[in-house]
Swiss-Prot record:
GO terms for cellular component: heterochromatin; transcription factor TFIIA complex. Forms a complex with TfIIA-S and Trf2. Residues 58-91 are annotated as: Disordered. The name 'Moonshiner' derives from its activity in the transcriptional 'prohibition' of heterochromatin. GO terms for molecular function: TBP-class protein binding. Residues 69-78 have a biased composition (Basic residues). It is found in: Nucleus. Disruption phenotype: Viable and ovaries appear normal. However females are sterile. Phenotype likely results from transcriptional defects at piRNA clusters caused by loss of Pol II specifically at rhi-dependent piRNA clusters in the developing ovary, resulting in a severe reduction in steady-state piRNA precursor levels and derepression of transposable mRNA transcription. It comes from the Eukaryota. Keywords: Activator, Nucleus, Transcription, Transcription regulation. Specifically expressed in the ovaries. GO terms for biological process: positive regulation of piRNA transcription; transcription by RNA polymerase II. This is Moonshiner. The gene is moon.
Length: 172
């Protein structure tokens, strides 16, 4: 005979009704098979059946309801970085101004490294520096690291000095 494995408290509904079915069959058999029952004995047998059924009902395991539905996962919104407040200034089309005219160029450096934060720098330079893309040719990671590690005012001063140095090198 195969060994019955423990159920760990998990009951099949049919297994819960099995003892009740056995009791009902046994009591029906007693009612049929015992001849000449008096009315008092018949009532006592019916009372016995109701008591046994009550005791059996107390000993029945709890039926296993369906497990609760899993809770919905909370979506954690990524933290937004505070963008510096943009200042409204006069904007001009760089190609409409003279090459030697000084213009204010707002340079945005995004957060390219984890230690950085997105920053804006307002740099004064001649229009030809922007038109020819001279800063793009001379800027490198060393300069960016130096500028982004410094506080706002100091970083702006360093970037302005770098731009002035590039412009001075191009004018000669």
């Amino acid at each position: 005979m195969a060994k019955i494995l423990p159920t760990d408290g998990i009951w099949i509904p049919e297994s819960c009704s099995f003892p009740e079915d056995v009791m009902i069959d046994m009591m029906e058999g007693l009612f049929r098979d015992v001849p000449n029952l008096t009315h008092k004995e018949y009532l006592a047998l019916a009372d016995l059946q109701s008591r046994w059924m009550a005791k059996l009902a107390n000993r029945q395991p709890e039926s296993n309801p369906l497990p609760p539905k899993p809770k919905k996962r909370k979506k954690i919104a990524p933290k937004k970085q505070d963008q510096p407040v943009e200042e409204k200034g006069s904007e001009v089309d760089i190609y409409d101004v003279d090459d030697n005219e000084m213009v204010n160029n707002r340079i945005y450096i995004p957060r390219l490294r984890s230690a950085w934060r997105a920053r804006y720098f307002n740099i004064m330079m001649r229009a030809f520096v922007i038109k020819r893309g001279l800063l793009n040719k001379h800027i490198n990671w060393q300069i960016l690291d130096k500028i982004m590690a410094a506080p706002d005012a100091e970083g702006q001063a360093e970037l302005q000095a770098f731009v002035d140095k590039v412009v001075a090198g191009q004018e000669m």
